[in-house]
Amino acid sequence: MTFLITAGPTREPIDPVRYISNRSSGKMGYAIAEAALDAGHDVILISGPVNLAPPHKAKFISVSTSDEMFDAVHQHADSSDVCVLCAAVADYKPAQVSPVKIKKCAAQVSLELIRTRDILESLGQRQNRQFLLVGFAAETDHLEANATRKLREKNCDMIVANDARIGMETDENELLIVFRNGETKKISRAPKTFLAHELVKIFLNSQQKSLTKKM
């Protein structure tokens, strides 16, 4: 099988030296890529800017902005069996990007933001998709409720949710998986490398069940 995996943050430029981003380290996405490779599968890893070396057996695509990640994902989704959208893609970007560095000249500066294109939602809207679609959700409260709502709104097959205060910029995480049929599965706090191997098993099992239903 072929796994398409996104990882890391995106950077939305304000001017040539400043940007909007987030604290995602990319460790979870990279660990999933390694686990899928260990299981003998092909991997397409689409990554925002991180301080990690890509798995040498993966097809690696480096991006910076949400638009670049959107385009790369759509280019490769249909050739994939499992799409794992683990990246922390910016929800908003500056409406205008200054071609020169913005100078400090006032006590307050307003920055107009507009929505970025929603990668998970755009894949969920595809008719007759053949790939398993997995989204991720980092939350600070109401973990299961927010994950369930995201699953329904984005029309994906499962959501892997975590408390952002536990998993951000660390080597460990604690996960709650919400499935399309309403079932949930909790994986207790553990190293991300261990969690990644458990997730790959779950993804493969879900994809096999999906294929069986379609036959």
Question: Where do the language-model regions lie?
Answer:
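A cross-family phosphate/adenosyl-ligand binding-site feature
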Residues: 1-215
